[in-house]
């Protein structure tokens, strides 16, 4: 029975999303279809596979993702999704993990992707007074038609042990410790554009930040120019170089230098961080637009207000109107790769378009003429009850490469119905 339910859910979802003929669905809410007239198991399996492929293609996927249990969804991506979900709610606060940059970037993008670096590429020689690391992010999964509008490199840094704010420093601390308390050091981000044999990489500075030792937080660096060059084919992706300049001048103790090196989480510590490292790894976030529809943070207040107005109208029971339809991703096994939401209210349109068409049926002039002709010639069909207003939803999911994506998909929710 479970297989039948899943099959019917796929058929229902396919009809809603692909055919656009939601008025043909004779069910309300989560009411299940009857099993009458169903195809043979072999036919149904092939039919469902074809529909699933079409749906995955609509999502920009070549095959159904099967992420491993070790796949990590960065908290930052979850925060971005929640910020989208609260869009239009003026009382909702922006999460602390993100700045204004993310909000501005998301307002211009309909696709947000996150990438972790390839750890085997990260080591570079340590130089006196600074720590240097190389990072390579594989961006080949970004489609060619997606234009990158912005990109940020996010680095997590811990408070340096003993570097609490000056106000909290012990009165018995040494002079050097007091000088160090609440100190600063600099993080530089470079684009590597050449790697000569046996020499230091050739690089250009992208962004820099003077950071305080006494704070634990994420730092965001603008790397848009480099990522745009790489994804547009105008430059070769050799990765980034991160340089941490320690505040001590001249001779420094190795222990003190190592402490500052660990302050910025640019590499995994041996035999440590097994649990914390996945959520503290450097993260590259790209913001792009494929030319289809609204941005992730596009407001829906106007449509929702129009919908509330439509609900208040008194409509005849059998006339064309919107009905409840909830799509549960767990029913079709898609909750394995769709992180959020667990499902959504798709709705559908059903009802009569009788002559004469009433004003609340949201009809076009053509539908009025067609219904008028039908009243004298039954060979001409009546106008049909169809969606007249559709809105997007955002999905947070893992693709076939286990990359975490937040994307806005158009025309997924019926907001209004009418006779057309």
From Swiss-Prot:
Glycosylation sites: 138, 167-168, 172, 362
Pfam family, one: TGF_beta
Xref: PANTHER family: BONE MORPHOGENETIC PROTEIN 2, TGF-BETA FAMILY
Name of the protein this chain belongs to: Bone morphogenetic protein 2
Signal sequence segment: 1-23
GO cellular component: extracellular space
Name of the gene: bmp2
Keyword Signal: yes
Role, per record: Induces cartilage and bone formation.
GO MF term set: cytokine activity; growth factor activity; identical protein binding; protein heterodimerization activity
The UniProt record lists the keyword Cell membrane: no
Lineage, broadest ranks: Eukaryota, Metazoa, Chordata, Craniata, Vertebrata
PROSITE patterns in the cross-refs: TGF_BETA_1, TGF_BETA_2
Family: Belongs to the TGF-beta family.
Positions of disulphide bridges: 320-385, 349-417, 353-419
Gene Ontology process terms (BP): BMP signaling pathway; cartilage development; cell-cell signaling involved in cell fate commitment; determination of left/right symmetry; determination of ventral identity; dorsal convergence; dorsal/ventral axis specification; embryonic viscerocranium morphogenesis
Assembly mode: Homodimer; disulfide-linked.
Gene3D superfamilies attached to this UniProt entry: 2.60.120.970, Cystine-knot cytokines (2.10.90.10)
Keywords annotated in UniProt: Chondrogenesis, Cleavage on pair of basic residues, Cytokine, Developmental protein, Differentiation, Disulfide bond, Glycoprotein, Growth factor, Osteogenesis, Secreted, Signal
Compartment(s) of residence: Secreted
């Amino acid at each position: 029975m479970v297989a039948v339910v899943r099959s019917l859910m796929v058929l229902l979802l396919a009809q809603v999303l692909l055919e656009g003929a939601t008025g043909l669905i004779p069910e309300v809410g989560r009411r299940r279809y009857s099993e009458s007239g169903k195809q043979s198991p072999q036919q149904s399996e092939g039919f469902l596979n074809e529909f699933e492929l079409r749906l995955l293609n609509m999502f920009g996927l070549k095959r159904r993702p099967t992420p491993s249990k070790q796949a990590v969804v960065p908290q930052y991506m979850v925060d971005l999704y929640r910020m989208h979900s609260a869009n239009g709610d003026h009382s909702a606060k922006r999460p602390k993990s993100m700045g204004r940059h993310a909000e501005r970037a998301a307002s211009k993008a309909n696709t947000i992707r996150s990438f972790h670096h390839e750890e085997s590429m990260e080591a570079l020689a340590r130089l006196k007074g600074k720590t240097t690391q190389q990072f390579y992010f594989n961006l080949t999964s970004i489609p060619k038609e997606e234009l990158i509008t912005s990109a940020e490199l996010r680095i997590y840094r811990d408070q340096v042990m003993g570097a609490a704010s000056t106000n909290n420093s012990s009165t018995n601390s040494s002079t050097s410790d007091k000088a160090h308390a609440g100190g600063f050091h600099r993080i530089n981000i470079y684009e590597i554009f050449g790697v000569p044999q046996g020499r230091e990489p050739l690089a250009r500075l992208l962004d820099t930040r003077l950071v305080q030792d006494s704070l634990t937080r994420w730092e965001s660096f603008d790397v848009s120019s480099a990522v745009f060059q790489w994804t547009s084919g105008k430059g070769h992706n050799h990765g980034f170089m991160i340089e941490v300049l320690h505040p001590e001048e001249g001779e420094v103790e190795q222990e003190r230098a190592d402490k500052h090196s660990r302050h910025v989480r640019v590499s995994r510590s041996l035999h440590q961080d097994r649990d914390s490292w996945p959520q503290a790894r450097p993260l590259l976030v790209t913001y792009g637009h494929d030319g289809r529809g609204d941005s992730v943070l596009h407001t829906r207040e106007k449509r929702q207000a129009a919908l509330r107005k439509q609900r208040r109208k008194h409509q005849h029971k059998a006339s064309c109107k919107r009905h409840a339809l909830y799509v549960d991703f767990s029913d079709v096994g898609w909750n394995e790769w769709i992180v959020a939401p667990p499902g959504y209210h798709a709705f559908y349109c059903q009802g009569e378009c009788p002559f004469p068409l009433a004003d609340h049926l949201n009809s076009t002039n053509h539908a009025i003429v067609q219904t008028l002709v039908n009243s004298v010639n039954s060979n001409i069909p009546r106008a049909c009850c169809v969606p007249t207003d559709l809105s997007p939803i955002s999905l947070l999911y893992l693709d076939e490469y286990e990359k975490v994506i937040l994307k806005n998909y158009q025309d997924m929710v019926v907001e209004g119905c009418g006779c057309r």
